[in-house]
Amino acid sequence: MTTANIIDLSGNSKGEIALPEVFSEIFRPDLIKKAVLSAQANRLQPYGTKLYAGMQTSAHSWGSGRGVAQVPRISNGSRVARIPQAVGGRRAHPPKTETDRTEKINKKEKRLAVRSAIAATIDADLVKARGHKFTAEVPFVADDAIEGLVKIKEVISFLQAAGLYDDIIRAKEGKHIRAGKGKRRGRKYKNRKSVLIVTGEESLLSKAANNLPGVDVATVTALNAELLAPGTHAGRLTVWTQSAITNMEGMFL
């Protein structure tokens, strides 16, 4: 059975805790990717073209006998309109709102993906492969006192003491303007993910850590593959509270 050191708010060890069986799950990157992509696909907003886009013209064909293509042309000229190969014409097969863009995943596969992603958080090689910067040893298990933090400076102080604050700096410096049209569609910046803090129950810690770059706070019951493996890449730098470890016993089976 794997054990982990429990660290207090000062970063000092205050004992050990046995990790649940879920932390010994085999690494399944294929299922993790499948679960994350399924979650992303299932929250897509339906989209489609305007019903009469490209059709609002009185263009009509000249018919045969003129030595030109029999395509719809505007009435006061010879410019082609309406058809897909014409400038400003309709699309041949436009996207439709009724299209089903969801992706299904079996329940057992989904649970296995979450278990595998949880186990990946204590694999130092996988955590480093994601690009995270830290000086302490994984896994990180914090005393329940962290759930009582209500100010961002208190959270920063804890992360510095635990040797995790370098990853916050990495996430802050990694923010950059997105390439392409997305920058003018409400998603101008691409942001990095840093530390995930998993608590036993809802607390004010989520508000205290809300403004730290890339930090997410979630209860153990709200864990999913996307939180544990952003971008389908497992091994997120994760801080577990003592109560989260205790409450996890028997979950995700």
UniProtKB/Swiss-Prot annotation:
GO cellular component, one term: ribosome
Taxonomy of the source species: Archaea, Methanobacteriati, Methanobacteriota, Stenosarchaea group, Methanomicrobia
Statement: the UniProt record of this protein carries the keyword Acetylation: no
Subunit structure: Part of the 50S ribosomal subunit.
MF terms in GO: rRNA binding; structural constituent of ribosome
PROSITE patterns cross-referenced by the UniProt entry: RIBOSOMAL_L1E
Coiled coil: none
Family statement drawn from the similarity comment of this UniProt entry: Belongs to the universal ribosomal protein uL4 family.
Any Gene Ontology biological process: translation
Organism annotation: Methanococcoides burtonii (strain DSM 6242 / NBRC 107633 / OCM 468 / ACE-M)
Keywords for the protein's UniProt record, in alphabetical order: Ribonucleoprotein, Ribosomal protein, RNA-binding, rRNA-binding
Protein name: Large ribosomal subunit protein uL4
Role summary: One of the primary rRNA binding proteins, this protein initially binds near the 5'-end of the 23S rRNA. It is important during the early stages of 50S assembly. It makes multiple contacts with different domains of the 23S rRNA in the assembled 50S subunit and ribosome.
One Pfam family in the UniProt entry: Ribosomal_L4
